[in-house]
């Protein structure tokens, strides 16, 4: 699915078009990230909560993975631990070949800066900077010059070249989130984590952002992991990982919105996974 036209939709009853196979970039070999028996526990005694229960998952390079599950299933905690934003209680997390659970704070900060891109529900753009200044800000802070050819590719893919001199208040919500996506990709990170990236957008703007994330994977060879509650958004991914009670309970390859919606219905009223 390459279109970011106004007709695109994240309606769970409507499957988005797919990028033609001839336009899909070959997947890079190896893993962008992985977790090995990752466990996260909050509290002690009567207040002890196991948010992640010995999860093992591989995230191949050049793949778009969506993470889904009911509220409290551990999906955001999983993303935060994979991205090095939260510490694991037990187990290991790798970005590339580096076990980030062994890094001190300084090296972990450097790893996140150099190897990880983030897209959040809030756009987090600086209002006094232009779109292009927001896109290059992380590299400017790190004292790194952008790869101009790659930056041009990213800018052309978000289709906002004519808006680069505009400040966030002069952009629509969808345009601001596309700028945030470009900022995450500008440094060519090992992996991009997106936490409900369309949560503040209408269906048209959300489809534009999801289309951009999908093209960044299929045409540019990036790796994206997205947490979402929306079956329509998940259908843009190559693979969906379903969480329940802090464990991976199912996976789906080449998902459709309808298939994802049906799987989500199999969680019971309390949010626990069901085999029914």
Name each model feature, range by range.
Residues 247-271:
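Conserved beta-strand-loop-alpha-helix hinge in the C-terminal portion
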Residues 167-177:
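Conserved ABC ATPase signature
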Residues 188:
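Conserved catalytic motifs of ABC-family nucleotide-binding domains
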Residues 129-137:
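Short coil-to-helix segment of the ABC ATPase nucleotide-binding domain corresponding to the Q-loop/switch region
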Residues 192-195:
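Catalytic Walker B motif of ABC-type/P-loop ATPase nucleotide-binding domains
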Residues 91-99:
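Conserved ABC transporter NBD signature motif
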Residues 98-99, 145-163:
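Conserved ABC ATPase "signature" region
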């Amino acid at each position: 699915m390459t279109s970011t036209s106004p007709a695109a939709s994240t309606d769970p009853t409507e499957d988005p078009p797919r990028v033609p196979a001839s336009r899909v970039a070959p997947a890079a070999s190896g893993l962008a990230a992985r977790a090995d028996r990752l466990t996260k526990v909050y509290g002690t005694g009567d207040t002890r909560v196991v948010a992640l229960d010995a999860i093992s998952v591989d995230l191949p390079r050049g793949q778009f993975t969506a993470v889904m599950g009911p509220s409290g299933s551990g999906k955001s905690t999983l993303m935060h631990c994979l991205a090095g934003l939260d510490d694991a209680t037990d187990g290991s997390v790798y970005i590339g070949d580096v076990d980030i659970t062994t890094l001190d704070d300084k090296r972990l900060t450097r790893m996140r800066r150099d190897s990880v891109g983030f897209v959040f529900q809030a756009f987090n753009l600086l209002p006094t900077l232009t779109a292009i200044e927001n896109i290059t800000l992380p590299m400017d802070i790190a004292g790194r010059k952008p790869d101009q050819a790659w930056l041009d590719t990213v800018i052309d893919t978000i289709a906002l070249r004519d808006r680069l001199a505009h400040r966030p208040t002069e952009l629509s919500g969808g345009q601001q989130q596309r700028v945030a996506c470009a900022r995450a990709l500008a440094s060519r990170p090992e992996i991009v984590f997106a936490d409900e990236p369309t949560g503040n957008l209408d269906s048209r703007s959300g489809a534009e952002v999801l289309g951009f994330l999908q093209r960044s994977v299929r045409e540019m060879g990036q790796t994206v992991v997205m947490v979402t509650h929306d079956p329509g958004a998940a259908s843009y991914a190559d693979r969906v990982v379903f969480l329940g009670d802090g464990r991976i309970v199912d996976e789906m390859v080449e998902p459709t919105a309808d298939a994802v919606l049906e799987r989500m219905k199999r969680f019971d009223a309390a949010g626990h996974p069901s085999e029914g």
